[in-house]
């Protein structure tokens, strides 16, 4: 599938319509993951880049269109109102965490969100503009109006899809889960993508960079550091 560059509405612009009187409900699931094995078991969400923790940066990246936010991971103080949940059993992987988060969102309002933003906590260069582009790509008319995209996924410079920086139609994503929702332990994220109609959104300015090692963290801290004052 070819990458697209969708038109972008201003940050906080009006909701896409899914019906004449039913605005699309946009929610988000932020996945904090476990302790990074290449980080000596350190909790990624608590690491700081540019004076903010990775969790704070992820929450700040969520556009104003996102009404409800579920964080899959340990409960910690946050400035933005969020709900916390965990996949059962813990350690089931990102697909299990994402499905658990969507289940929490469904229980919160009594129905599924129309669109759900999935964002890994270890992508600190993702911004509201990134999420706006993904939402715009999902809502853009495709070549077949009867078969609209079911997911808009960020793609890095090497062409690798980033399924944890994406926007999904929640019902379509859950329909792609093989078997029952509670049997997602260890399910690869790529398995969920197999049955979905995807649109790829190219990353800009390092948006797809993630934190897997101490070297990654050092590089990202240097990248966002302000320039030294002129002598």
Where are these regions (language model features)?
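Acidic two-metal-ion nuclease catalytic site recognized across multiple nuclease folds
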Residues: 219-220, 231
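PAPS-dependent sulfotransferase catalytic core
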Residues: 210
